[in-house]
């Protein structure tokens, strides 16, 4: 690998450094207090009985993780199986060394290996370096779709209609 950098699939022991990189990304994205995820939640969600994400890391000779690509399987009703790239981050000191490309290539290879028909991700509209990076790789950066979100408080306060509660119950063979 480049400059004694190793690209590998992430393991549970990487999570403290991964969470640190995620926090570094939040600072870069002007949202330093937005990360509420915890190490325990990442251990449960990535390495529990039903893992919901995977990741690749770049590790230097000092065993420091300098890059991360975290992704998960998603589904497009229009296209089918896809991978969603949640975070692609290289620590600031290692940027512009080709490491983002190594991580992105690994995710593309994973998408191909798992039969995904699409790889999707988000990029902030002001993050020109990232937009340029993705465009250089041949990606189309969409402008017509807006994202909707409900945060933890909104989810808790949302008034669920009785029919929706029934729909979320185990299947009984009846339809709504």
Residues of each region from the PLM?
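A short, internal acetyl-CoA/4′-phosphopantetheine-binding micro-motif in the GNAT/acyltransferase core
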Residues: 88-95
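Conserved acetyl-CoA-binding loop-helix of GNAT-fold acetyltransferases
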Residues: 96-109, 136
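Conserved beta-strand-loop-alpha-helix junction that forms the acyl-donor binding cleft
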Residues: 121-130, 149-153
């Amino acid at each position: 690998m480049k400059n004694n950098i190793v690209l590998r699939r992430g393991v549970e022991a990487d999570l403290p450094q991964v969470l640190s990189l995620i926090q570094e990304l939040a600072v870069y994205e002007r949202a330093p207090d937005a990360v509420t995820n915890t190490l325990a939640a990442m251990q449960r969600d990535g390495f529990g009985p039903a893992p919901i994400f995977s990741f690749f890391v770049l590790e230097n000779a000092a065993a420091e993780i300098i890059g991360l690509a975290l992704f998960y399987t998603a589904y497009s009703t229009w296209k089918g199986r896809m991978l969603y790239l949640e975070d692609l981050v290289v620590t600031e000191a290692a940027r512009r060394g080709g490491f983002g490309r190594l991580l992105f290539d690994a995710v593309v290879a994973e998408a191909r290996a798992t039969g995904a028909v699409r790889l999707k991700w988000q990029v902030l509209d002001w993050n020109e370096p990232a937009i340029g990076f993705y465009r250089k790789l041949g990606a189309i950066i969409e402008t017509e779709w807006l994202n909707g979100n409900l945060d933890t408080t909104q989810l808790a306060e949302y008034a669920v209609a009785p029919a929706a509660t029934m729909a979320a119950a185990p299947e009984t063979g009846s339809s709504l």
